[in-house]
Regions:
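Short acidic/polar active-site loop segments enriched in Thr and Asp
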Residues: 88, 155, 190, 271-272
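Non-catalytic positions within long, well-ordered alpha-helices that form the structural scaffold/packing
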Residues: 185, 266-269
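Short, charged, surface-exposed secondary-structure boundary motifs
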Residues: 303-308
Length: 308
């Protein structure tokens, strides 16, 4: 049976995520401790604390989700004998791609934590707060949404996430996003939900962040992954470290093509995916496809015990 392992992205975080792992599995605790040491901050205190606003700062959110995802994977290895080499492919939603690269031994855990903190800072600082925005658009196909954006001459707006059938996210200037959401509701009678983010991710407004990340990445070693990584940008299995590095930079200001990644899995006979990390966003997305790929979420100790 062909399987893939997938890792969630931003929006999956919640206070206390991974605490059960930290308390019950020494292999998981080591992951959290190593990330704390790499960042020279007590990220665990933020994750396990009570200040949601602090956790939701992008520079904290990104390494936090990665840490919990890898801690989850390590617990699966220890308790269930999970072997990464038994998976045909590995993928992650946006920042989740870094979790995938750590899982595939392409990037060191400590390096991924440092890169993600910098990535979060660069993405936050690329656009002044209040200038950009994002919105989820539901029950519309991506091609129809793109035509509507073009027809109404919203020059700053791009489809930034193509998540699954009937679920897209747009990014752009805040005033244009506000106008678009009103038109979507009034003219197309579709749902348009403004997202609680402080920057317009995965669009051309993030180009300064991509440039900054490009310079920062030069100091880190990225190796060829042990299993192919299906890129958010290319939607093909990537094995070459130089190409992976280029795609990580491109991902910052390009669309997350998650719907196409799931379709790639189906076309390559993947029967089951494991979502390894906080929440169940990816598992829920899998359910929206006409074809069936079983997706099993591993987010808490009960999920862990019941797996396999």
């Amino acid at each position: 049976m062909k399987k893939s392992i997938v890792f969630p992205g931003q929006g999956s975080q919640y206070l206390g995520m991974g605490k059960h792992l930290y308390d019950n599995f020494s292999v998981s605790k080591r992951i959290f401790d190593e990330v704390d040491d790499a960042l020279n901050i007590k990220l665990t205190e933020i994750i396990f604390g009570e200040d949601a606003e602090k956790l939701n700062l992008t520079e904290n959110t990104q390494p936090a989700i990665m840490a919990v995802s890898i801690a989850t994977m390590e617990a699966l290895k220890k308790e269930k004998g999970l072997n990464i080499n038994n998976f045909s492919f590995c993928a992650g939603h946006s920042l989740g791609e870094y979790s995938a690269l750590v899982a595939a031994n392409s990037i060191k855990l400590a390096d991924a934590a440092k890169i993600l903190k910098k990535r979060g800072q660069a993405m936050q600082n690329a656009v002044p707060i209040g200038l950009g925005a994002m919105a989820a658009i539901l029950n519309i196909q991506v091609e129809d949404l793109e035509k509507f954006i073009t027809a109404n001459k919203f020059l700053s707006i791009e489809v930034s996430n193509d998540n699954c059938p009937g679920q897209c996210v747009v990014s752009g200037k805040k005033d244009e996003i506000n106008k678009l959401t009103i038109l979507i509701k009034n003219e197309l009678k579709k749902k348009a939900i403004p997202l609680p983010v402080s920057a317009p991710f995965h669009c051309k407004m993030m180009t300064p962040a991509a440039d900054e990340l490009n310079n920062f990445l030069k100091q880190f070693e990225i190796n060829n992954p042990e299993i192919p990584i299906v890129s958010n940008v290319s939607v093909i299995p990537e094995n070459d470290s130089n190409e992976i590095k280029k795609l990580l930079i491109s991902c910052v200001h390009n669309r997350v093509r998650w719907r196409e990644i799931v379709e790639f899995f189906f076309n390559n006979n993947i029967i089951e995916c494991i979502e390894c990390g906080p929440g169940k966003a990816l598992t829920n997305m899998f359910k929206r496809f006409e074809f069936e790929i079983k997706c099993v979420k591993i987010d808490n100790i009960d999920d862990l015990k019941n797996y396999g």
